[in-house]
């Protein structure tokens, strides 16, 4: 186990953990003691009909959701709903390569985990800890959108509403190549040592390279041309790296990022229907608003729209934002108001 203050409540905000026991993985591995970190807001009502699940995205935790999306002035209103954000397996807070006490799966030996494994684990936690068997809604961004799609395809009778934001039900070839490049940024660092480093600081050069790759692709070309980084209080394009992305990514655990990236690469709900994506999405019963971000270079509108057309009764709600994919961090003034408007309408449906 490695010490890394980035993955603590002091940095990420309060959370709890719960063990769901032995989890057999789709790829054949096993996590003997699978425990998940989660954070909640609001009160579960008597008939347990007001629960909203928020899965987490690549490199992220519940923190951004609680800081930017949840509040009595937002659609995700804890005075109305019981909101639970469950950190995905391998994200640094839930059981992960660097925090497991099981030496057989620590560090480079941590098994490959699929999106489906996360959803099965989340379902088990919700039942075990709260007695929740149905969800008012699932809302997730990026890899959280992948998990949202998995929920509504795997458990179509358990989810009443869904909002996948800036993500797809089946990963695209472009994103597969991009995530492979993300992996190479850290794997090429000699300090990575095949995943058996003794501190994330030994992989500083690789983590910095990953930060720079996110700067190039995570923010759109318009974000840079219009100097939209000024809204973040930054003084130059160089400070986007030096004062924002570099400190963020250089605090992270490399094996955690690799585990997340493999999962992202292999996200595909059509595994439930023999590779037939239309059949998989045709199973969805939840009222679904698909919300791509207009300038997203990972999950462009046309990819999300093509999937939305396969979901019965769904709607395409494009979020207009020049920030691109990292607009998920609430970079632009008009971002959260659009999210809130769409979610409020979805929740009232």
From Swiss-Prot:
A biological process term (GO) from this entry: biosynthetic process
Role according to the record: Esterase that catalyzes the hydrolysis of 4-nitrophenyl acetate in vitro.
EC number: 3.1.1.-
UniProt-annotated catalytic positions: 142, 296, 325
Free-text note on domains in this protein's UniProt record: The 3D structure excludes the ability of the enzyme to bind homoserine and acetyl-CoA, indicating that it cannot function as a homoserine acetyltransferase.
Organism placement in taxonomy: Bacteria, Bacillati, Actinomycetota, Actinomycetes, Mycobacteriales
InterPro entries linked to this entry: AB_hydrolase_1 (IPR000073), AB_hydrolase_fold (IPR029058), HAT_MetX-like (IPR008220)
Gene3D superfamilies, per the entry: alpha/beta hydrolase
Pfam family, one: Abhydrolase_1
Annotated family: Belongs to the AB hydrolase superfamily. Acetyl esterase family.
Subunit structure: Homodimer.
Keywords from the named record: Hydrolase
Positions of the AB hydrolase-1 domain: 60-329
Name of the protein: Probable esterase Cgl0839
NCBIfam families: PRK07581.1
An MF annotation (GO) of this entry: hydrolase activity
């Amino acid at each position: 186990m490695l010490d890394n203050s980035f993955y603590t409540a002091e940095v990420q905000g309060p959370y709890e953990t719960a063990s769901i026991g032995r989890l057999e993985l789709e790829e054949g591995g096993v996590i003997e003691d699978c425990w998940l970190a989660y954070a909640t807001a609001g009160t579960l009502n008597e008939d347990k009909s007001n629960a909203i699940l928020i899965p987490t995205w690549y490199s992220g935790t519940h923190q951004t959701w609680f800081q930017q999306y949840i509040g009595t002035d937002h659609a995700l209103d804890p005075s109305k709903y019981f909101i639970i954000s469950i950190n995905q397996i391998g994200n640094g807070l839930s059981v992960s390569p660097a925090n497991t006490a099981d030496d057989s799966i620590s560090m480079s030996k941590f098994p490959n985990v699929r999106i489906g494994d996360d959803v099965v684990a989340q379902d088990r936690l919700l039942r075990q800890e709260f007695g929740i068997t149905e969800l008012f809604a699932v809302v997730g961004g990026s890899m959280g959108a992948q998990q949202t799609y998995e929920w509504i395809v795997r458990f179509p009778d358990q989810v009443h509403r869904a909002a996948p934001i800036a993500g797809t039900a089946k990963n695209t070839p472009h994103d597969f190549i991009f995530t492979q490049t993300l992996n190479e940024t850290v794997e090429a660092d000699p300090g990575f040592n095949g995943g058996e480093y003794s501190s994330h600081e030994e992989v500083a050069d690789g983590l910095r390279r990953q930060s720079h790759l996110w700067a190039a692709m995570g923010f759109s070309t318009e974000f840079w041309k219009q100097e939209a980084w000024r809204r973040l209080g930054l003084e130059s394009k160089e400070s986007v790296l030096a004062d924002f992305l570099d400190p963020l990514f250089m605090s992270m655990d490399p094996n955690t990022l690799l585990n997340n990236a493999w999962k992202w690469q292999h996200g595909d709900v059509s595994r439930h229907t023999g590779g037939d994506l239309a059949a998989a999405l045709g199973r969805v019963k939840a009222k679904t608003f698909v919300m791509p971000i207009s300038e997203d270079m990972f999950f462009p509108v046309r990819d999300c729209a093509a999937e939305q057309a396969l979901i019965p009764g769904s709607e395409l709600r494009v979020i207009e934002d020049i920030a691109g994919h990292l607009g998920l961090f609430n970079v632009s003034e008009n971002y959260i108001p659009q999210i809130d408007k769409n979610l409020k309408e979805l929740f009232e449906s």
